[in-house]
């Protein structure tokens, strides 16, 4: 109960920020999220991606953040409280520990969200950086569903005109759950590329909604 209270408090705060900033969000496919722990995989162009997605998590969800976030007092403590994990991108051994902890969380019934580009993509609006395959071990080892999250126009909120915040329309689409066991052997072997193709097709499709 305490965990869910924390989740709802953070969600309330994120929703309040989005309301104040005047961001209008078109949400598609929210009903695709199964009532079970999942691995959310999203493209990443803005700090606001976290607010847009976390504010809609139906169950406890730990986000995988970059290691540098762990150095921020209070924030890092609160993040740990809501099952967030810190990934050291420069240290493969420590990175593996983080993935193993994420696997353990899923087994406990907690969803995980990760942006496998590894950093914010500052390229063209419909571009993506290559997905890092390590994140997908979470689904491969637990058998949980992967739910793709495709986001359009989120960099226009803040990053495109830093430090100003702009009222814009964004699109967030939750894709059909992907269960690794149901994939063809070749797709299972390159699951990162498989999921990235789905997100790429979706952001291309939704560009006309902006």
Where are these predicted regions, by residue range?
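Catalytic core of membrane glycerolipid acyltransferases/transacylases, capturing the structured
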Residues: 1-12, 18-21, 35-92
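A generic structural signal for well-ordered alpha-helical segments
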Residues: 17-18, 79, 105, 139
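Short gly/ser/thr-rich secondary-structure transition/capping motifs
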Residues: 19-28, 95-96, 154-156
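Generic preference for hydrophobic
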Residues: 27, 40, 63, 114, ...
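Glycine-rich helix-loop-beta junction characteristic of Rossmann-like nucleotide cofactor-binding loops
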Residues: 29-33
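A short, glycine/Asx- and small/polar-enriched loop/turn
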Residues: 34-36, 166-167
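Non-catalytic C-terminal accessory region of glycerolipid acyltransferases
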Residues: 96-210
